[in-house]
Amino acid sequence: MTEFRLVLETYANAVRSGWPAADLERAILHDLPRRFHGLPAEAQAGVLATAPSLTHTRWDALIAAMIEHVARLHRHDLPAWIDEPERFLDRTWVLPDIPFMRRNAILYAPAAFIRHGALPDPRDLDARGGERHAWVP
């Protein structure tokens, strides 16, 4: 079995490829942190160091927020690229469509997501760090 190498550009490529929004959310909010948590600290630092190219969509903010979030969880220095202005939204994006889930996202989103303006349902950010097994759309 070959080991998956976590490369953030994979998620930017998924955005550019036109994946459905639900698949992008699942990949960024579940798959990315699961794979990140499974890496040794040195490999995590390597992932953080390489910025994904910009897609010029709101997904750039969500990717940056997720990386900021997992970097803080693992006590890594924050990569400079997450502070690029293009990785912030001028208008807050609340991902869930269901009213009570939107309220939870607004009230309980972690600081990294609030800062970037992309608010997922915080229940998607479980302590396990995403899904237990690799997910392929």
Residue ranges and their predicted role:
Residues 2-81:
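Charged, helix-prone or intrinsically disordered regulatory segments positioned adjacent to compact structured domains
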Residues 74-137:
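Charge-dense, extended regions
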